[in-house]
């Protein structure tokens, strides 16, 4: 497949609807307009026309929009046909267009890919299109739109420009060592480097917020049978998502709920009670529970407050704690406070968070919601914020590491050449976000996750 091909795809969701849109982009778009419409519409005006078959009979009628390149979404000639949204009608029209030479069905995300390749969008903006479509909350949608409008890219580009200026200064000091002013030791480079590092830290903090909005937080509820795990899932979900009985081992498989806390997506996972099980089905459920625990962002360790007064997880169940991944955050949830009379609320026990609540009555559950939000550093007021993906966080972290290494070289040995190289690598890491330095393989993976007509 070539980027010189003319591509066509349905731009509206499959199925029946009031309107169905076909989008065509490429050199042959003009020929499609003349063949199907009988004329070339006036650029950027809505023209109501019949959509004709090869023999001149009308297949449909609707709005035609003509956007000659480079003033179009893709930067190429683009034709949009907006007809009726019946799948049969759209299929007939699509088949008609594909009878013309030089046209093919677009790959997923190929329209956005062409916009990127033709400098209509950078890579972060192109990704924001998919994120806007997939947004699961109002806040996520607003942040995705900010990214599409360039909020994230602008911040990254400012960092790249600052690094470029700093590299020029450092390399001038290297190339002209006999000058009276020692650029490397006069403090100016260190001051500029500190400014860039502080700006990068601010962008990283906002990117983590944006990643939380997009990816969400995976929270696994784990503990012994009958500790109240399913009751807590229901309390957090606000509905009867799980069956709750007094019979130990009622939950035998993984249950998932997706909720939002002040805009932050939360993936809650209820698991089978952990114990030595002789029943094969329950044993499989317990193994699945451990698989989810190992992939969690946080574990809610449910404890039946009527069975123990211990609050330290190592005292409550040392074998469970020993099996957990080393850096996995734990919140001990002492349940059934309505029966024990314990004081509700959050406290700290040996570096672990402890919360007392009643999953049955809902008392203390709001404290848990706030704790989950705060534990991830999530801020509800993100006006002007942007969405970020995991690869963006990795690129920002790589850039920060290179700047740390560069500063160490500057302060330790006044090694200008090594500092300049670390600045170059940091600049390259940041440029991967916007696509200035990005492999073709990565581009393929990114755009293949898009909708067909985007």
Curated annotation (Swiss-Prot):
Disulfide bonds: none
Cofactor(s) demanded: K(+)
Record-level GO cellular component terms: cytosol
GO BP terms: tRNA methylation; tRNA wobble uridine modification
UniProt-listed CDD domains: trmE, TrmE_N
Single GO molecular function: metal ion binding
Residue span, TrmE-type G domain: 216-377
Binding positions ((6S)-5-formyl-5,6,7,8-tetrahydrofolate): 23, 80, 120, 454
Alphabetical UniProt keywords: Cytoplasm, GTP-binding, Hydrolase, Magnesium, Metal-binding, Nucleotide-binding, Potassium, tRNA processing
Positions of Mg(2+) binding: 230, 251
UniProt keyword Nucleotide-binding, yes or no: yes
Cited function: Exhibits a very high intrinsic GTPase hydrolysis rate. Involved in the addition of a carboxymethylaminomethyl (cmnm) group at the wobble position (U34) of certain tRNAs, forming tRNA-cmnm(5)s(2)U34.
Family, as annotated: Belongs to the TRAFAC class TrmE-Era-EngA-EngB-Septin-like GTPase superfamily. TrmE GTPase family.
Protein name: tRNA modification GTPase MnmE
Species: Enterobacter sp. (strain 638)
